[in-house]
Design a protein with these regions (language model features):
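Accessory N-terminal region flanking or inserted into the helicase ATPase core
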Residues: 1, 19-21, 88-171, 182-184, ...
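P-loop NTPase Walker
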Residues: 1-73, 499, 503
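Conserved RecA-like helicase ATPase core segment
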Residues: 6, 186-265
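Conserved two-lobed SF2 helicase motor
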Residues: 56-62, 143-147, 151-152, 429-436
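Conserved Walker B
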Residues: 169-180, 184, 203-204, 452
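Helicase P-loop NTPase motor core
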Residues: 226-228, 233-319
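Conserved helicase C-terminal RecA-like lobe
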Residues: 345-515
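Helicase C-terminal subdomain and adjacent C-terminal extension
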Residues: 479-483, 489, 507, 513-546
């Protein structure tokens, strides 16, 4: 993405009064694009600063806000005061001050359709959604995150506005496009004219289907436009690692076709007797990794509770680690954001700016209110992790370009959109425990994936469904997938998660499994994911592989 933007700017294909729009999925990623361009452009052109100013970098919501700042008055004159708006999601209690339960149902109807990726239902409910925004929320300087996109789409339906931006942005380039939902899809469609539009993405890394990421979004565009498809065939991450390169190729093949693969690869798999042995083995490995090098290691789990016993053993052994095993729906997670946003606004006051003193005051105020965030000592780890991410955010924000007002808006957006987990790449701890979904976009030298058991990874939902439709060979302590016709979508969703997990490793990935007794005193079965045709196992000991 960076190279393409730099190349087009260097060639002079973007005239002086036009721009490039680069869109990504987080504020942090947007900042990194700007930084990378600043490093690369001086190698290609003189006076590189003037070229950098020709690139607008944003995520979907940031871009929507920019449109509304400039033209929102054409929809509702209150958008003139957009910088004073509170931005919330549909579940925020603030909305109860302005709307009825009937109005709330209208907002939730769109959110439900969005998560289900139901385009027809979205068309049915979007006007009702807009009416609630326009008559109840916008006049009170409140808007939802979905509402930002709905408003921007409505604005771009005005021919003068959309025509201007199709000409203004001579190139639109979007990263991680496979995670785009219907509102993002509609927004992008309004920017396509005779300009160059580039979508970058990888279908096998689409792991946010439960949030509404559109299935087969690249195929939708192939049907609609004369698309030129460019496939990247070289995996530079694993170019010096033949084992991981082969594993990448094998797992990817299961995302592309629904049949036993023609490829072969091996994976490091340790088979242990029970949960205790598995947890002890993992902790021993972590200890060896961090004491023999400066390398970092992540334990990636399918669900947060699978990592809790490992966290307990690390604590007892005195090994420092960053614990990000909480869920986005946890009370402590939600309460932290409520307190952090409140204190951030209090610290900044009415200035709409974020200076260093304000950020320090915010951190201290959040620390003083920590007892509001967690109710038991066992849940304090959520507060500790979130507080550390908030510290990292404030520290990294010093490096951002722009004014203190820009800084305020970016921090406010990250907090409001619950985006602190994107700051995990900047933490100092050499050991991280987190979920696979939270790890997307991050890398560590070593990755450990525990609990490669049926009902753990894949999830219980897939395993139960698979058995009901007879799509598995269900053995005493193993399970093999049979590629039943009704299981393709669910299977590929789990393959995508598996692929994301193994490709977080830069040097090596280690899997563990045990066939001890489960909570019902039945023997655990190994996961069908480690029994895939073409995948062989390497037993390993830490003394040999580290």
């Amino acid at each position: 993405m960076i190279s393409k933007i730099a190349w087009e700017l260097g060639k002079g294909t973007i005239s002086s009064n036009k721009k490039v729009l680069a869109m990504t999925f987080s504020v942090n990623a947007a900042m990194k694009i700007k930084d990378s361009l600043k490093e690369l452009l001086p190698e290609l052109v003189e006076n590189s600063e003037q070229y950098i100013s020709k690139v607008d970098v944003a995520n979907y919501h940031n871009f929507a806000m920019k449109l509304l700042f400039k033209h929102g008055y054409a929809l509702n004159t209150e958008f003139i005061n957009l910088s004073d708006f509170i931005i919330v999601d549909e579940s925020n209690r603030v909305l109860n001050n302005y709307i009825t339960s009937f109005d709330s149902d209208k907002l939730n109807a769109l959110d439900d359709a969005l998560r289900a990726s139901d385009e027809e239902e979205m068309r049915n409910v979007i006007d009702d959604y807009w009416n609630v925004l326009n008559t109840k929320l916008i006049p009170n300087h409140v808007i939802t995150y979905n509402g930002l996109l709905v408003s921007a789409i409505k604005l771009l339906r005005k021919r003068q506005v959309s025509s201007f931006y199709k000409e203004y942005y001579r190139m639109v380039i979007i990263d991680e496009f496979q995670d785009t939902n219907i509102l993002g899809y509609w927004l992008v469609n309004k920017l396509i004219g005779d300009n160059t539009v580039i979508f970058l993405g990888d279908d096998i890394q689409k792991i946010y289907g439960f949030l509404g990421a559109i299935n087969g979004i690249f195929e939708k565009y192939k049907e609609k436009y004369p698309i030129k498809e460019i496939k990247f065939c070289n995996n530079y991450r694993f170019r010096a690692n033949e084992c991981l390169k082969a594993l990448d190729k094998l797992i990817r093949s299961y995302g592309n076709t629904y049949a036993p693969s023609e490829y072969e690869a091996s994976v490091n798999l340790k088979h242990l007797a029970n949960d205790t042995e598995e947890d002890n083995f993992i902790v021993d490995g972590i200890d060896k990794i961090i004491n023999s090098s400066n390398d970092k290691v992540a334990v990636l789990v399918r669900a947060g509770n699978q990592g809790e016993p490992i966290a307990d053993k690390l604590s007892r052994k005195g090994i420092q680690y960053f614990n990000a095993l909480f869920r986005d729906t946890d009370i402590e997670f939600l309460k932290f954001y409520e307190v952090a946003i409140d204190e951030f606004h209090n610290a900044a006051g009415s200035s709409g700016k974020a200076v260093q003193k304000d950020l320090l005051n915010c951190l201290e105020a959040v620390r003083q209110r920590q007892n509001e965030i967690y109710s038991s000592a066992r849940r304090k780890f959520v507060y500790d992790a979130m507080y550390k991410l908030l510290e990292v955010l404030f520290e990294e924000s010093k490096k951002w370009e722009g004014t203190s007002k820009d800084r305020y808006e970016n921090i406010d957006f990250i907090l409001g959109s619950k985006g602190l987990k994107h700051m995990m790449e900047y933490i100092e701890e050499k050991v991280v425990l987190t979920t696979i979904h939270a790890s997307k976009g991050l890398e560590w030298e070593y990755v450990i994936i525990p609990r490669m058991n049926a009902y753990a990874f894949p999830t219980g939902y897939m395993c139960r469904t698979c058995r009901e439709v007879h799509s598995c060979n269900d053995g005493f302590d193993y399970c093999k997938f049979l590629f039943g016709t009704l299981m393709e979508k669910t299977f590929k969703e789990e393959i995508s998660v598996f692929y994301v997990a193994i490709t977080r490793a830069k040097k090596n990935v280690f899997l563990t499994v045990n066939t001890g007794l489960n909570q019902w005193n039945h023997t655990k079965q190994t996961s069908c994911l480690i029994e895939l045709p073409g995948l062989s196992h390497n037993d390993y000991d830490w003394e040999i592989v580290i």
